[in-house]
């Protein structure tokens, strides 16, 4: 909420402002503190799992995307957004089970992350072998000054749909999936900053605002 340091004549509208202006933290340190429930100690970075050191193994691709389109549209995702993600190969349909696969790329446009999700009634989902979470699924825009974080790709696409329904251009928003639920531990020193977020802040120094869309 809002705060004011009367003796210094400075104030702000968020905890992020307070930690930077009053506690003297830099932006990344302030974000780490907030993500860890506000403790002054800093969490460690999330280390990659051993399977992430392997090359990314993408599933066989279906020649059509009919099942994936029907599934995502049934989840309320806008048809235009679905098609654009398909055109950019951010989403593919796999064989033999016709799962939806969400793909993340590195700076060279090489696929480095992939998460699959069943398109039927089952709850089968997970990361493909070799997935590197720092390149998680995202819809990016440059020089926005902010980033919106989501637990999963479906949540991200749902928000993009809501932006469009609200008359906003969803392509002008920086939307990033954390590729899983983030839950800081009671002891902040045992918590880990999501590697997706830490890499994002290292690479894009223009980001000054982080919007959390977490369950």
Regions inferred by a protein language model and the residue ranges of each:
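Modules that initiate DNA replication and primer synthesis
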Residues: 1-28, 187-215
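Non-catalytic accessory segments of DNA primases and related replication-initiation nucleases
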Residues: 1-71
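Terminal peptide-recognition signature
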Residues: 5, 19, 72, 102, ...
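Helix N-cap/coil-helix junction residues
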Residues: 24-25, 77, 147
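Basic, glycine-enriched DNA-binding surface that flanks or lies within the catalytic cores of DNA
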Residues: 49-133, 138
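Flexible, charged surface loops at secondary-structure boundaries
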Residues: 95, 139-144, 203-206
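Acidic, glycine-rich catalytic loops of TOPRIM or P-loop NTPase phosphate-binding modules used
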Residues: 146-209
């Amino acid at each position: 909420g809002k705060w004011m340091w009367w003796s210094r004549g400075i104030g702000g509208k968020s905890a992020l402002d307070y930690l930077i202006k009053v506690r003297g933290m830099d932006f990344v340190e302030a974000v780490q503190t907030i993500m860890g429930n506000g403790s002054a100690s800093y969490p460690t970075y999330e280390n990659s799992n051993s399977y992430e050191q392997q090359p990314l193994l993408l599933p066989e691709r279906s020649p059509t995307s009919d099942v994936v389109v029907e599934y995502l549209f049934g989840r309320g995702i806008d048809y235009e957004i679905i098609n654009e993600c398909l055109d950019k190969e951010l989403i593919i349909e796999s064989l033999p089970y016709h799962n939806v696969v969400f793909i993340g790329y590195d700076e060279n446009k090489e696929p480095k992350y992939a998460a699959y999700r069943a398109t039927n009634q089952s709850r089968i989902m997970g990361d493909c072998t070799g997935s590197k979470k720092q390149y998680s699924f995202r819809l990016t825009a440059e020089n926005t000054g902010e980033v919106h974080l989501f637990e999963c790709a479906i949540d991200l696409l749902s928000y993009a749909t809501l932006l469009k329904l609200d008359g906003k251009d969803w392509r002008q928003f920086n939307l990033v999936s954390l590729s899983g639920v983030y839950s800081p531990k009671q002891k902040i020193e045992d918590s880990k900053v999501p590697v997706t977020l830490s890499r994002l802040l290292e690479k894009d120094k223009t980001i000054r605002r982080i919007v959390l869309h977490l369950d």
